[in-house]
Regions:
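Alpha-helical subdomain
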Residues: 2-89, 198, 203-380
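Conserved Class I S-adenosyl-L-methionine-dependent methyltransferase catalytic core
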Residues: 9-16, 22-55, 65-66, 72-202
């Protein structure tokens, strides 16, 4: 199963023209700098001012006057953005306030610029990359060599994984992390709930429940279900407070601990075990270990649901690209040994623990999640 053919011919053919290949290579050479150019345009408000100017556009001189940034500063950012297709030069340059021969003319927002400014998916990814990944990525080589998240040290030396650090991150970084984490899975919840509740489970275990969003969605969806959130102490503390504020303190319980720790005992009698964007936090070997612990705590009637964005099951190449990039976050920041998985390798790791794949659902939500339904093998 792990050798199944990928669904995009892009991964197999190399038909790109040499001149186009060179262009792409040159873009890669400057990506770190061009990324920061766009960040500067966003955080100074310059990109928004250009957008607000509409089809007539706005000159570098006007942008400088409005922002208090030198014409030089505005100019170098604008020229880079032109080269990236983020900005365009207005065809209505007779309206420009800067008539000097050296003027670029009026700048207008291009389609790429619109997505950087307005598209929530792009903004979440951009902020996550800048606030969580960018500085730590300089340690990617060491992370690859050592099998440890060497980039995490940019936030401090007290943690071995990012999950232990979450509650201690600065507010901006914490906000970017949680917005990234929630943005993807939250969009799939409306389609996931009918799948999980098809058999009307009474007891649901949410392993890796994080802030409790899924658990609270379950309580709203089914008035009779009880949910147990199993996660690290920092996360269960936050989830418990959120559950209390939502009025679900009597329907959501909490088990604090590391599921990989032999001393962490899972509760029993689950009708459903749910793991959303949780297993990608572990290596394949660790996934098998976690599922073995689950295997020993559930009976043959329990349904295991795993929701993950599998990069080889995405509808569009850009989504696969984003997931492949997210794998590098796991390598240098999160834990040093996990990634965003392919369908076959994830199924194989889970089945090694004694489960069989019963059913799979793909392309759920705007971000194309998969839900994999497993049950215990009759004869392990």
């Amino acid at each position: 199963m792990s050798n199944m053919k990928l669904n995009n011919d892009f991964y197999y053919n190399d038909k790109i023209r040499a001149i186009d290949a060179k262009e792409e290579a040159l873009k890669i050479a400057f990506y770190p700098i061009t990324f920061q150019a766009i960040r500067s345009l966003l955080e100074t408000g310059l990109l928004q001012k250009i957008s607000d100017a509409g089809d007539n556009g706005i000159s570098v001189k006007e942008l400088s006057a409005q922002s208090g940034i030198s014409e030089y500063g505005v100019g170098v950012l604008a020229e880079m953005a032109l080269g990236m297709g983020v900005l365009k030069i207005s065809s209505q340059n007779e309206n420009t306030a800067d008539t000097s021969k050296s003027s670029l003319g009026n700048l207008v927002l291009g389609k790429i610029g619109w997505f950087l400014l307005e598209d929530n998916l792009t903004k979440v990814n951009f902020n996550f990359t800048n606030d969580i990944c960018y500085k730590g990525a300089f340690n990617l080589i060491d992370s690859i060599k050592n099998g440890k998240p060497e980039g995490l040290k940019v936030f401090g030396d007290n943690w071995t994984t990012v999950y232990e650090a979450l509650s201690s991150l600065p507010e901006r970084e914490k906000k970017s992390w949680f917005e990234f984490d929630h943005f993807y899975s939250d969009a799939a919840f409306p389609e996931a709930l009918p799948i999980v509740f098809q058999k009307k489970p009474k007891e649901l275990f949410d392993i890796g429940g994080n802030t409790g969003k899924w658990a609270m969605n379950c309580c709203r969806y089914d008035k009779d279900v009880h949910v147990s959130i199993i996660d690290l102490p920092g996360q269960t503390n936050v989830a418990e407070q959120n559950a209390k504020e939502a009025g679900f303190q009597n329907r959501i319980s909490f088990v604090s601990g590391n599921v990989l720790d032999v001393n962490t005992k899972l509760p029993e009698n689950a009708d459903v075990v749910w793991m959303s964007q949780f297993l990608d936090c572990f290596s394949l070997h660790q996934i098998t270990k976690i599922l073995t612990k689950i295997y020993n705590s559930v009976d043959e009637n329990c349904d295991i649901f795993v929701m993950e964005p599998l990069w080889d099951m995405q509808k569009f190449p850009a989504e696969s690209y984003a997931l492949q990039a997210t794998s590098l976050y796991f390598t240098c920041i999160a834990n040093g040994n996990s990634k965003m998985y392919r369908f076959g390798e994830l199924v194989e790791a889970i089945e090694k623990a004694g489960f069989s794949l019963v059913q799979s659902h793909h392309n759920l939500g705007a971000n194309f999640y998969s839900i994999l339904n497993f049950r215990k093998k009759v004869n392990k």
